[in-house]
Amino acid sequence: MTITPDRDVVSLEREFSDYAFEQMHPLVKVWRGDQLKTDIREATTRLVALIVDDAAGKYAETLKGLAQLPEQFKMRLIEIERYRFLAQIDFADPSASLPFVAIFGASTPPGTIADARVVRWLADKFAVFAPRRIRFYQSAHVPIEAAGTHVDQHFLAGLAREMAARPSAPGLARVILQRPTDLGFYRRYVETYNLMYLERPQIRGEVRIETEETLAACHAEGLLYEIEVDGTWAGIVAARHQVVAGARGTYMVEILLNGAARGQRLGPAVHQRLAAKVAAADSSAILTGTIAAVNVPSLKTATRAGRVEIGAWHWISV
């Protein structure tokens, strides 16, 4: 569909912001209050801009081997029967051999669309890439009705001040968070991950090592900490301020305990220490984060720490 840059873009921003607000988890509406609509509008504005800006050209340039025009990579407004979607082609691997359609906005929560033809028709709009899967986000309070879906990543959140005020987590007195002066720990961090991959090979590809650039950005925001257990280095926890799935919060980029500290149920204590620091800076802050479906230990830790599942990204095959 052709979009007229001024009038149509503003109309789409309003339309898809309304959809996102209607579909938002009730807890987020309570936590964010009047600010939520502003959060959603800012996020939606960035999405709609991808329909008309030149970012697709830059993306296409990095994937020259696919020999497709830049327009094929743009965010698209797609209408199928009574449904409207903002969707874009994406790839699950750097070689672009695993294409999928990413839904970023929808008039109806995609997981409630029981008619399998709709997702097939949506995939057909990107037929030049031959996608076999569609990925979408849906709030946890909305039941999944579409057949053949499974969770890719869980999205959990909690009000930081409430997490900090919970009864002391086991081992809390043993855990200290210290802000590092630099990223001198990075090599040790990577080594810790590589050892964990050996112990739990199923998480390789699902849980990634963060780049120095990403952790430096967390450090710049004052949200990077080294974890000490009993006075000894035991890992890191890092976060950033950002909007994810329409919810503005302090997003947990990383939480990693080394082999010596894992298995002692200290994860909730790390969460509680971080929540206290975040709440001290902003009493209205939400602590958010994604957890891969295969990372069951981290999911259990997050829920024990007081985070609740407010949504998830799902896969559906076509």
What are these regions (language model features)?
Residues P201-G259:
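A conserved beta-strand-loop-helix scaffold within acyl/acetyltransferase catalytic domains
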Residues H141-H154, A292-G311:
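Conserved active-site alpha-helix within GNAT-family acetyltransferase domains
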Residues M1-G57, P167-E210:
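Short amphipathic alpha-helix that is part of the acyltransferase structural core
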Residues T2-A20, L36, A87, A92-D93, ...:
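Acyl-donor-binding surface of acyltransferase catalytic domains
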Residues A114-D124, L257, G263-A280, L299-R304:
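Conserved acetyl-CoA-binding loop-helix of GNAT-fold acetyltransferases
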Residues L287-I291:
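Conserved hydrophobic beta-strand within the GNAT/NAT acetyltransferase core sheet
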Residues K29-Q35, D39-D54, K58-Q88, A220-V237:
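Conserved beta-hairpin
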Residues S317:
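Positions that flank functional sites
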